[in-house]
């Protein structure tokens, strides 16, 4: 009961802190729509790097990673996050280009180069995906609170998580999101960095734990190189076309900061990969002494609760909630931003909104979308399959149009437009054939992105050989010259 009390105090303190951040930022820092949507484009290295890291680290990279290490993956589970870390390195090439666009959203950039149809289709895919992800992540945050503090009813936990997310995101916008991301990732990293050596020491030390593990558990490539490479490409594709990632690069104070933030994020994520993996292995070695759920689903919390002080367990509890909530707030704000910035004008919105109206309607979208998401989560609507599908479909189609649209100045309009449709169709077909998994060691989002790139290059080659002019620039500065 002491552990639950410590966890409750720390988790509630964290949630109150997040609401205070949102309120203060909203009152002091939000002067116009640029402040609300892209943090005034003045964020520094550490703010952006920690925000990128927080958005990459979800429940799957904390409790999920420990569970994989406990299961068949062993120490090779570390690649589940290390692959994401490595994917941030080539992303550093695109980071300054993203910042240079001076855009707010991905559909805005796609529309500049390849026209209104491309922009509208990309916006619809992104908004549907972000809504599904927001729904599941608010639900996941509530479920984590309930699992850690079961004395609070599940629906109350869900409402609590949803209300906190709505409050600080709606009041503080992107600035509050980034400040909260900094705090959240700090809690995750510091909490796990403190807890892991304490657990290992009280469990007999790493030498004793490793001696109790089967040999395959200590094989760094147990999952196979095909899976490792597949995860790398999967992360790269989803990062480049992920609204929550792109929006962070848009907030950088300059292009150099964007490059450095991407590389620092890679370092931070590599550090994060270590701790849950070690805790999962410790839980496996000590499983005869622990009351674990099936397949070690709660391995990280159980081994921490058994071998670390209550306050450390509470810190880990807050870290797990941070991991899910940091994704929920970003997806919620990105979705509302696209509705006002892209969907509204793209589908017939006549009235040009001023700064105050943009902020008001974006905040209204935040509240409405989050309330609907909370209702869906309360009725236990299964979203896992839908989320997997939505997460890929927002990236596979627009991958070439956005990524190569930034990098290939001579691209034609049809190369971007056609690649969006072929990439999306390829993703859907591969998702069906692979039944949501992999086929020939290739994940659906990677296959869809590959098809979109091939289509983009072929159409562009054919049209340029026929003398068709290049599409307009993705960069406002170049268009103004």
Predicted segments, located by residue:
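Membrane-embedded helix-loop-helix hairpins and adjacent transmembrane boundary segments
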Residues: 1-481
């Amino acid at each position: 009961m002491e552990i639950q009390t410590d966890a409750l105090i720390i988790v509630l303190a964290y949630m109150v802190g997040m609401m205070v951040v949102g309120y203060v930022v909203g009152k002091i820092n939000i002067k116009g729509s640029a402040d609300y949507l892209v943090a005034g484009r003045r964020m520094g290295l550490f703010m952006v790097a920690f925000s990128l890291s927080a958005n990459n680290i979800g429940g799957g990279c904390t409790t999920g990673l420990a569970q994989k290490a406990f299961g068949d993956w062993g120490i090779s589970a570390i690649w589940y996050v290390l692959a994401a870390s490595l994917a941030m390195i080539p992303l550093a090439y695109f980071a300054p280009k993203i910042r240079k666009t001076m855009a707010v959203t991905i559909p805005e950039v796609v529309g500049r180069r390849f026209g209104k149809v491309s922009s509208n289709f990309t916006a619809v895919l992104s908004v549907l995906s972000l809504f599904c992800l927001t729904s599941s992540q608010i639900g996941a945050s509530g479920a984590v609170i309930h699992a850690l503090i079961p004395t609070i009813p599940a629906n109350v936990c869900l409402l609590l998580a949803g209300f906190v997310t709505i409050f600080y995101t709606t009041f503080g916008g992107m600035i509050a999101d980034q400040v909260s991301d900094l705090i959240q990732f700090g809690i995750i990293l510091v909490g796990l960095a403190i807890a892991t050596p304490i657990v290992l020491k009280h469990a007999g030390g790493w030498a004793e734990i490793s001696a109790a593990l089967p040999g395959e558990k200590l094989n760094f490539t147990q999952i196979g190189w095909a899976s490792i490479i597949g995860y790398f490409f999967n992360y790269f594709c989803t990062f480049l076309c992920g609204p929550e990632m792109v929006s962070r690069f848009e907030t950088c104070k300059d292009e150099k900061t964007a490059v450095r933030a991407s590389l620092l994020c890679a370092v931070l994520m590599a550090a994060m990969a270590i701790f849950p993996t070690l805790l999962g292995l410790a839980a496996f070695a000590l499983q005869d002494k622990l009351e674990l759920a099936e397949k070690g689903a709660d391995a990280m919390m159980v081994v921490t609760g058994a071998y670390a002080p209550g306050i450390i367990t509470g810190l880990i509890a807050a870290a797990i909630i941070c991991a899910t909530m940091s994704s929920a707030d970003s997806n919620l704000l990105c979705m509302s931003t696209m509705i006002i910035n892209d969907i509204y004008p793209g589908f017939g919105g006549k009235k040009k909104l001023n700064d105050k109206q943009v902020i008001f309607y974006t905040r209204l979208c935040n509240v409405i979308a989050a309330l609907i998401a909370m209702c869906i989560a309360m009725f236990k609507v299964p979203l896992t399959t839908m989320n997997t599908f939505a997460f890929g479909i927002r990236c596979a189609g627009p991958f070439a149009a956005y990524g190569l649209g930034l990098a290939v100045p001579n691209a034609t309009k049809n190369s971007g437009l056609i690649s969006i449709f072929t990439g999306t169709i390829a993703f859907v077909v591969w998702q069906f054939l692979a039944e949501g998994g992999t086929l020939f060691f290739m994940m659906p989002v990677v296959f869809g992105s590959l098809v979109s790139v091939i289509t983009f290059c072929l159409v562009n080659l054919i049209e340029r050989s026929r003398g068709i002019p290049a599409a307009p620039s993705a960069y406002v500065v170049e268009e103004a010259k």
